[in-house]
Amino acid sequence: MEKTDIITLMQLPDVGSKTVLKLYNHVSNRRLINLDFNDYISLIEEITNKKFMGIHIDKSKLKAEKLLEQCYLNKIKIFSFLDDDYPDRLKKIGNDKPVILFSKGNHDIMKTGYNLAFIGSRKVSKENYKIGVKFSKLAVDMGVNIVSGLAIGCDTAGHRGALLTNKNLLSGKTLAVLPSGIQNIYPKKNTTLSNEILEEEGCLISEKPPFESPEKYDYIMRDRLQAALSESIFILQSSLGSGTVHTAKFGEKYSKKIFCYGINTQNKGMELNKKLINEGKAFDINSEEQFKLAISKERDEHYEISH
């Protein structure tokens, strides 16, 4: 199955990653070979009990051509789940993996090094924001990559701290997982931050085509990628109503170690931190030194296993 076929199929009405994965499994299980695009259309119709008119197919081809051109002009790489260089971290999440992923910048962050998801609520206290920037810089200075979602609040603290690194050869980078297309940064307020990430050899990724706006469900999909692309997760500050809850759940599902900032968990906005620590689902971090020791230990163990 060629990448262009996958992209074109996904431009058809109501055809997404799950349908394409069903198609791929169907083809693999039957050991079907030498199929062309029209064969894939017929098989999708068989799988979904839908009939696509000629106009739908023609439109999907035009949309795919436009999408490929947009990516070429904006230096965006398209990963297919069948590519040899598709990130192993995403292969490991099985049917949760993106079928198509758009990436701009330093793609290697998805594939190498030790990644820490640095997350939390959009509403963050001034004190915790400063602590977040400091912790993130500490991690990157230790060669750890910071993965976050480019939202305001805790995400911004994570990215900003990463950009303050001493910039030696061993320094980590930062990767932003977007709920929107790479050329349509959301929130707009962080457009400058996204440019700085690229300038400092970081990376922007998204499942959305370059110029698309985010839908409600895209935020949850973004949260799963943050968890999948990281070896462990650090929650700076989060309420129980924050999207961070989704990332924590995906972290549990993917067997990721979770750390929570544990100071003043009785304060408003720290409810998720308190809950995860009390339930034994997260390790509490109460100081810079403790953060440094915990993350360096995780990093070293990761490299021992991978080598």
Predicted regions and their residues:
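Glycine-biased, small-residue-rich flexible motifs in mid-sequence functional cores and linkers
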Residues: 81-307
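Short, positively charged patches
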Residues: 1-129
